[in-house]
Amino acid sequence: MKHTSLVLLTTLCTGISNMSVAAETSTVSVDNADRIRPYVKDVRYWQYKGEPVLLLGGTKDDNLFQIPDLKQHLDLLASVGGNYVRNTMSARLDKGFEVHAFRRLPDGKYDLDGWNDEYWTRFENLLRWTHERDIIIQIELWDRFDYTDARGANHWQVSPYRPQNNINYTGEETGLADRYLDDPWRDKHPFFHTIPGMKRYDKKYDMLRHYQEQFVAKMLSHSLSYGNVLYCMDNETSTLPEWGQHWMGFIRKAAAEQGVDVYVTDMFDDGWKPERSEKIRLELDHPELYSFVEISQVNSRNFGEDHWRRLQWVVEEVKRHPRPINNTKIYGAGKTSWGSGEPENGVQRFWRDIIGGCASARFHRDGGGTGLQPISQASIKAARKLESLVKLWDVEPRNDLLEDRSENEAYLAARPGEAYALYFTDGGSVGLDLTGSEGEFQLSWINVGTGDWADKQMLQSGNVVTIAAPAAGGWVAAITRHDSQD
């Protein structure tokens, strides 16, 4: 049995290691000022290379760096205007092409002190190819579904961290069991309780945390050189916040050693009901810990006006400590029992997120969402056309300017008297209050279902103007002062 000597430090209250992270692999050079960061003129949004950006995306897998046709998939995303991907550091052996991060020995066991070069080459390729295409990556370090045997998943059975699968420690030494059959949301796996001070922490877990930190340090040796990376600690975690806060501190310390700025957050499972979530409250109240707000779970279980209401609750609360609000997952496929909805629900959520003041919107992978399917491509193309006339950082949600509006019929973002973005979920007509404005406005229709331009029309200001969508289905209208079109 091979063992590693541990040196436990108390650099921070969370026990962050003193491990220095050097850029061992990546050679790309990025000016710190050009890295992804909140937009200097409106911190609700991001800027990249000094320019404001609206992050839009959709991809077919969550551990994106593992897919064999990655470069082609990124090219397709970029071709429709996408600039945002999600990447979990997962290695679930679901589809036959995934590999683990650690060196596998001839007897089939893993050595957690050695690396699988293929895994890290794939990750480096993702970093390099997205960098070349100006695509922003939102990385998730940990996914609770990677370590469960619930419902026949058997992911823990093949995990290198399972004591029976490696040469580095035993179950007795670490307190790790042979099987974990509980659903991940129950948060019973010791893997997520390795931080001193957590309620379920046991000193036996220190050895496991050593290897966790070694893995994250290796990841950062690749990613910190790139300026197109955001960091989210977990996928829909139900673990206590101390877990994610440890990893946020670990990443910040490593970035500080290299003199670069990074932006970190966590994703909480109960974000679908944010007004009742103590963890979301913590995230909102502590911008010094959570650099941006990741609210993806609001895009599940919530439909129509309820989705808008809960999203706007977050938007209003964030005004106390303004930061970007990201949606790296928008559900909308499969009609699951827990509320993913159908594809049209995903499209509506995507547009409510954009009109509602969010900094990013990405369709969840196939199976949970519509990924980069044609329906997603059309919405991304339509959103870019809208953005060509109405910059979302120049407007804010203003449904109060709409009259004769039915529930979930239409949503508005506006800078009154200057620019309006009006989204219809499925045809319909509403009154738009243009009183107090002067001159003419040009309305340009965009078909959400195809991503194509449609008709234009002129609107006279000074009163409430009735606007009717050209047909059934999703439509968005870009309404701007006529003199701004000249």
Language-model features, listed with the residues they occupy:
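Active-site clefts of carbohydrate-active enzymes
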Residues: F292-R301, E305-E344
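Structural recognition of alpha->loop->beta junctions
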Residues: E283-V293, W351-S360
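Active-site mouth of glycoside hydrolases
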Residues: V28, A33-Y290, F303
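Conserved beta-strand positions
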Residues: N87, M233-D234, I295, N327, ...
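Boundary at the C-terminal end of the N-terminal hydrophobic targeting segment
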Residues: S20-A23
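Positively charged n-region of N-terminal signal peptides that target proteins for export
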Residues: M1-T4
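Bacterial N-terminal signal peptides
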Residues: V7-N18
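Aromatic- and carboxylate-lined catalytic core of secreted/periplasmic carbohydrate-active enzymes
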Residues: P324-I325, G332-T336, E342-Q457, T466-D486
